[in-house]
């Protein structure tokens, strides 16, 4: 397996990040237009034919454009400034001080110096299972997080391979790409959940006010449209997540000149990757191996279309042939 040059990979991921940033508001706009069309089709009696329906749809959509732009900007601003704290809370991570574990700091510093990289922050998850992940969107927020179990159960060469894997995610800028994709998917998930909860609440009060029937229809349409966006955005996110693991494995092998050490580490990680605190699927894909029960059956159904990680056996086999 040949590793793509660092400059090439950075350029590709920067381009993909830009495409996602453009695609996100475009998809929101398309789905908003679909919602407007369905809403008018089901709620307005059209005596003038299809032309009038489209004209009303266009007018409603134009009126909503400022809200679309404002919503997208607010969502990304919030995500930009809060992604690190949200991920830390979702994984149960905390800062690891140098005095707690000089060994980890020495390994990270040596690898960073060999690559001319700025030292990232280091966090630890107090869990005896074996896992790790990288996060952040710039040099001020880049972080390598290791579980207590992976620190205690891997030797220095294996741990160096894992750290190199996470540093490759940072160096290639695919951490930023993945977080953008997580934000991209998150808004559709949020909208679908809001609509679903609203429909449930409205159904309880429907008998008190027959006018609620129209409101429920609007919410159902919103939920359907949001679910469509969530489905396609999730497929895109999974595809990005799977490919980045292969690239990070290859980058770590190149960085350490010891692919067998990372292969050995992955074999140990696969035996116990479950991190108890991790419940969110979008956060789970950040890890070197899926930290939940799905890690053992990630490729079941649809040939792995919905898998966040490639088969770890395949990753090990590639490293052993590197």
From Swiss-Prot:
Signal peptide start-end: none
Cofactor(s) this protein requires: Zn(2+)
Record field: transmembrane: 19-39, 61-81, 175-195, 216-236
Gene Ontology MF: a single term: zinc ion binding
UniProt cofactor note: Binds 1 zinc ion per subunit.
Residues at the catalytic site: 166
Cellular component GO terms, alphabetical: plasma membrane
Chain residues that bind Zn(2+): 165, 169, 245
Membrane topology category: Multi-pass membrane protein
Broad class of enzyme this protein falls into: hydrolase
CDD domains xrefs: M48B_Htpx_like (cd07340)
Top-level taxon of origin: Bacteria
InterPro entries, per database record: HtpX_protease, Pept_M48_protease_HtpX, Peptidase_M48
Compartment(s) of residence: Cell inner membrane
PANTHER family attached to this UniProt entry: PROTEASE HTPX, PROTEASE HTPX HOMOLOG
Protein name (database record): Protease HtpX homolog
Organism listed in the record: Bacteroides fragilis (strain ATCC 25285 / DSM 2151 / CCUG 4856 / JCM 11019 / LMG 10263 / NCTC 9343 / Onslow / VPI 2553 / EN-2)
């Amino acid at each position: 397996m040949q590793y793509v040059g660092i400059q090439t990979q950075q350029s590709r991921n920067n381009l993909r990040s830009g495409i996602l940033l453009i695609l996100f508001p475009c998809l929101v706009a398309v789905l908003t237009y679909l919602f407007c069309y369905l809403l008018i089709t089901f709620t307005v009696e059209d005596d003038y034919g299809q032309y009038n329906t489209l004209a009303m749809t266009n007018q409603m959509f134009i009126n909503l454009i400022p809200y679309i732009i404002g919503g997208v900007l607010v969502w990304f601003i919030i995500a930009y400034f809060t992604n690190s704290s949200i991920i830390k809370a979702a994984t149960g991570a905390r800062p690891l001080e140098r005095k707690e574990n000089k060994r980890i700091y020495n390994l990270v510093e040596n690898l960073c110096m060999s690559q001319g990289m700025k030292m990232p922050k280091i966090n630890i998850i107090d869990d005896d299972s074996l896992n790790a992940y990288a996060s952040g969107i710039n040099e001020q927020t880049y972080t390598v997080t290791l579980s207590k179990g992976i620190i205690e159960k891997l030797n220095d060469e294996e741990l160096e391979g894992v750290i190199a894997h996470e540093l490759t995610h940072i160096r290639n800028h695919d951490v930023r790409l993945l977080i953008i994709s997580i934000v991209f998917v998150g808004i559709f998930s949020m909208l679908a959940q809001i609509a679903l909860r609203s429909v449930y609440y409205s159904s309880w009060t429907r008998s008190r006010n027959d006018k609620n029937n129209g409101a429920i229809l609007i919410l159902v349409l919103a939920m359907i449209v949001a679910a469509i966006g969530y489905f396609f955005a999730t497929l895109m996110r999974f595809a990005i997540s799977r490919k980045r693991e292969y690239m990070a494995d290859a980058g770590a092998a190149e960085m350490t000149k010891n692919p067998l050490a990372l292969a050995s580490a992955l074999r140990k990680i696969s035996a116990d990757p479950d991190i108890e605190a991790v419940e969110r699927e979008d956060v789970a894909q950040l890890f070197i191996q899926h930290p939940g029960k799905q890690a053992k059956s990630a490729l079941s159904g649809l040939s792995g279309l919905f898998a966040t990680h490639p088969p770890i056996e395949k990753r090990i086999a590639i490293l052993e042939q590197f």
